[in-house]
């Protein structure tokens, strides 16, 4: 059984100084914690500094994004090869904020997943429906489309983690109900089984969307929830430590 995976997505927060101050407080109070894997995804500008600290811990260095080419005239982009060189192990691909603000579609996301896996990186592939999708009973249809298109010709389930993040629950304080999470995670698991057969069990499915120290226990008790992707609550070392220690 894979370890539970708890990932901090800092988004566009923390200077290098603030990131290092977080680690100074967070690492000692979570040291020696067994039975779970912890990941932290800082901004690109903090990756090298954070990575130098994490190298002496079991915490995994994650990135929030990557481009689908390893080099070239792509102003402002960062390649999988560059991230790997900095010690990154996991890359978040397909986050709803990337889809919304940077117009990333399933084709771009699929190319990014291919590029990261080819470089030996593991991928945290984000999927999720909007509030309008759920109101129109299209949740499963949307999830199926995102999974099938995003994982097209991806034959390495051992390199994949899926993060189910209903868009309407991200940063809103609104958490999907236990039944909604259970149904969606079961659907995702079954989709993965259709694609990968028994190898689908190698893929962890995380929940993301207003995860807090107050709701982490109930979320982790839901079937097929094998971790969480944490946004706002991961910015505070004490709050994130409480989530990790649930």
UniProtKB/Swiss-Prot annotation:
Q: Which GO terms describe its biological process?
A: gluconeogenesis; glyceraldehyde-3-phosphate biosynthetic process; glycerol catabolic process; glycolytic process
* Family named by the database record: Belongs to the triosephosphate isomerase family.
Question: Matching Pfam families, A to Z?
Answer: TIM
The record lists substrate as bound by 9-11, 171, 210, 231-232
**What is the active site of this protein?**
95, 165
Q: Which UniProt keywords apply?
A: Cytoplasm, Gluconeogenesis, Glycolysis, Isomerase
- The name under which this protein is listed is Triosephosphate isomerase
Single GO cellular component term = cytosol
For this protein, what is the EC number? 5.3.1.1
Task: Return the broad EC class.
Answer: isomerase
What is its biological role?
Involved in the gluconeogenesis. Catalyzes stereospecifically the conversion of dihydroxyacetone phosphate (DHAP) to D-glyceraldehyde-3-phosphate (G3P).
| Record organism | Thermodesulfovibrio yellowstonii (strain ATCC 51303 / DSM 11347 / YP87)
Q: Which reaction does it catalyse?
A: D-glyceraldehyde 3-phosphate = dihydroxyacetone phosphate
> Which pathway, per its entry?
Carbohydrate biosynthesis; gluconeogenesis; Carbohydrate degradation; glycolysis; D-glyceraldehyde 3-phosphate from glycerone phosphate: step 1/1
* One of the record's GO molecular function terms: triose-phosphate isomerase activity
The gene that this protein is the product of is: tpiA
Query: What assembly does the database describe for this protein?
Result: Homodimer.
Q: Where does it localize? A: Cytoplasm
